A protein has these predicted regions:
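Anion-binding and metal-coordination hotspots
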Residues: 1-311
Length: 311
């Protein structure tokens, strides 16, 4: 019932209110579907995610819509690339490797990646596929610092008895396992975390430097992750591991440097993940053609890895 001088009935009011709620719900459902597991998306390009860009030199925390581009490099050629909406590299490793296996038709015997790709799930996947990991631990650089080595709160600086499964802290107190809990990652991977608790932190003169907890000091340890991390850590310290890590830095970062700076490709011209992937594929093809031409000119055909210079 509409028009001047007419009062709407209660049913009419309820009906119109319900219709507004229904329209809002449809809009909210569409927005929720557009998130695709993210906490934000760009209205002009729903596949894009707001991220911190490296061009924010003043660190003003500027957020811009973008994509996480991953490339795989072999012998200085880009052999695989993919586009992700997730901002963290760690969640792109397994999907990227699966795409590589599918597209290339074979599997590389080893995988070299930066510390941003390290996770228990990634290590487990590489072990299942029988690929040797050369992944730098996330705490690799911290381990070298004097402040880390002198931090009594760190598990790495505590003595560990493998037979009794007990840690000993700086004050010579025992940290024993009290329970095991399950943790699920974003992708659904389930890991076991053993919780260790100190026998008594009361009146300990070092408590302020060791823990902020009101009660006893606790450690949360994934034994499976530590075992796999140690394996990868030992791999990167070998001669092969050192050479692979050096070449990852030269070839992968070098490829991104050429694409961004030499080609001056700072911004995608198209929108949507499918179109962006097509754009980066064409760009990588051009890069590979230029790389092939440069290798022919410099008589470097068959050259795969840069050698480590002896000190």
């Amino acid at each position: 019932m509409y028009g001047r001088g007419k009062r709407k009935s209660k049913n009419q009011k309820y009906f119109e209110l319900f219709r507004k709620f229904q329209e809002r719900q449809v809009t909210y459902d569409w927005h929720t579907a557009s998130f695709q597991g993210r906490n934000n998306y760009c209205k002009t390009d729903p596949d894009a995610t707001f991220m911190h860009m490296k061009d924010d030199h003043m660190r003003n925390a500027q957020l811009k819509p973008g994509y996480n581009i991953q490339i795989g490099v072999d012998s200085e050629y880009i052999v695989a690339t993919d586009v992700f909406s997730d901002r963290k590299d760690v969640w792109t490793l397994i999907p990227f490797l699966k795409t590589m296996d599918e597209k290339l038709g074979f599997r590389y015997p080893s995988v070299t990646a930066d510390s941003g790709y390290e996770s228990e799930e990634g290590y487990t996947y590489l072990r299942e596929t029988r690929q040797t990991p050369y992944i730098k631990p996330q705490t690799y650089e911290k381990w070298k610092r004097r402040s880390f080595k002198q931090d009594i709160s760190k598990r790495e600086n505590m003595a560990y008895d493998a037979e009794t499964d007990v840690y000993t802290c700086y004050a010579q107190k025992k940290l024993s396992p009290v329970f095991v809990k399950k943790q699920k990652s974003k992708s659904g991977y389930e890991s076991e975390v053993t919780v260790y608790e100190c026998e008594d932190c009361k009146d300990c003169p070092h408590k302020e430097k060791c823990t902020r907890a009101k009660g006893n000091k606790r450690l949360y340890v994934s034994k499976s992750f530590l075992e796999k991390r140690q394996e990868s850590y030992e791999n990167i310290l070998t001669e092969t591991g050192i050479q692979y890590r050096m070449n990852r830095s030269i070839q992968v970062e070098g490829a991104f440097g050429v694409l961004k700076n030499d080609y001056e490709f700072q911004k995608f011209l198209l929108r949507g993940k499918t179109k962006v992937k097509l754009e980066i594929l064409l760009l990588c093809m051009g890069y590979n053609l230029n790389k092939l031409h440069a290798k022919i000119q410099n008589e470097r055909i068959g050259f795969h890895l840069f050698k480590v210079k002896s000190a």
